[in-house]
Design a protein with these regions (language model features):
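Non-catalytic C-terminal accessory region of glycerolipid acyltransferases
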Residues: 2-10, 132-246
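A transmembrane-helix-recognition feature enriched in membrane-embedded lipid enzymes
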Residues: 3-62, 113-118
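Catalytic core of membrane glycerolipid acyltransferases/transacylases, capturing the structured
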Residues: 27, 31-32, 36, 71-128
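Hydrophobic alpha-helical segments typical of transmembrane helices
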Residues: 49, 86, 101, 110, ...
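Short gly/ser/thr-rich secondary-structure transition/capping motifs
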Residues: 55-64, 167, 193-196
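A generic structural signal for alpha->beta connector loops
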Residues: 58-60, 96, 117, 149, ...
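Glycine-rich helix-loop-beta junction characteristic of Rossmann-like nucleotide cofactor-binding loops
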Residues: 65-70
Length: 246
C-alpha cells in the first residue's frame, strides 16, 4: 500500500505536473512522426522520451529478471496494474511489447495516433466475444508478418486497482495464452502507485519504480478448462511478488 507522500514530494509533484503535460504534448506527435518515417522508430523515441521525462521528474526505473527480449517466440505478459505509471515503466523496461487498451481511449485523436504507432490494440471490453475476435485477429496478423504472435501485455485486472488493493484477474489473458500456446510471463510492478496515484492527475512524485519479470509459465498441454487455475496461479505469484519490498 502506498504511504502518504512527504510534504516536499507533494510540492515537487505540483512542479512536475506542467512538465509531464508538456512532455506528453511533445512526445506523442514525435512518436507518430518517427514511426511514419521508419518502422520501429516510434518505440525508440517513446522509450527515450519516457526516460527523459522520468529523470526530470525525479523518477527512476529499475528492471529485474529476464523479460521476453529480442527473438522472443511470443509471450503473454501479465503485470499488476496500480497506476498509470505502469505503462511507461513497462515500455521503458521492455520496449518491444505491445499493449491492449480499452477502445474508449482511441477517441482521443493524438493519443490514438501515438498508440497505433506503438502497435497498441483497441479492445472492446464490454463485449467479450468481440474482444476475443480482436485478440485472435491480432495474433494472426503478427504470426503472418513475423512468424510469432509477439509479446502482448494484458492487464488482467481490467483496469487500475484502487490504492492498496488488487482487483480479481480476468480470464482473457490466460485464454489467449492457452489458445496460442504462448507462455505467460508474470510481472510485478512495485512503487508505481507511490510515484503516481491511481487518480493522480499527472501529479508525479519522485521515487523508484521496479519492473520485475518473474519466471514464465508454460501453457503447453493446457486446455480452456485450465484457464481458471492458470489465472489464479498467476495472480498468486504476482500478488506475492508485489508484496515483497526486496
Amino acid at each position: 500500500m502506498a504511504s502518504p507522500p512527504a510534504p516536499r514530494h507533494r510540492v515537487r509533484a505540483q512542479v512536475n505536473r506542467p512538465l509531464v503535460a508538456a512532455g506528453l504534448l511533445v512526445l506523442l506527435p514525435l512518436v507518430v512522426v518517427a514511426e511514419r518515417l521508419h518502422r520501429g522508430a516510434g518505440r525508440r523515441v517513446a522509450r527515450w522520451g519516457v526516460a527523459v521525462v522520468a529523470f526530470l521528474c525525479g523518477v527512476r526505473f529499475e528492471r529485474r529478471g529476464r523479460g521476453p527480449g529480442p527473438g522472443s517466440p511470443g509471450v503473454v505478459v501479465v503485470p499488476n496494474h496500480s497506476s498509470p505509471m505502469d505503462i511507461p515503466a513497462l515500455l521503458w523496461a521492455e520496449p518491444e511489447v505491445r499493449f491492449l487498451a480499452a477502445a474508449d481511449l482511441f477517441r482521443v485523436p493524438l493519443l490514438a495516433a501515438a498508440m497505433r504507432a506503438l502497435g497498441t490494440v483497441p479492445i472492446d471490453r464490454r463485449d467479450r466475444y468481440r474482444a476475443r475476435d480482436q485478440l485472435d485477429a491480432l495474433v494472426d496478423r503478427r504470426r503472418a508478418a513475423t512468424g510469432s504472435p509477439g509479446d502482448i501485455v494484458v492487464f488482467a485486472e481490467g483496469g487500475i486497482a484502487p490504492a492498496g488493493t488488487r482487483l480479481p484477474f480476468r480470464s482473457g489473458a490466460f485464454s489467449l495464452a492457452i489458445r496460442t500456446g504462448a507462455p505467460v510471463a508474470p510481472v510485478a510492478i512495485r512503487g508505481s502507485d507511490r510515484v503516481l496515484a491511481p487518480r493522480g492527475h499527472l501529479l508525479v512524485r519522485p521515487g523508484v519504480v521496479t519492473v520485475e519479470f518473474l519466471e514464465p509459465i508454460d501453457t503447453g498441454g493446457l486446455t480452456s478448462d485450465d484457464r481458471g487455475v492458470l489465472r489464479d496461479h498467476v495472480r498468486d505469484i504476482v500478488c506475492a511478488a508485489t508484496a515483497s519490498t526486496s
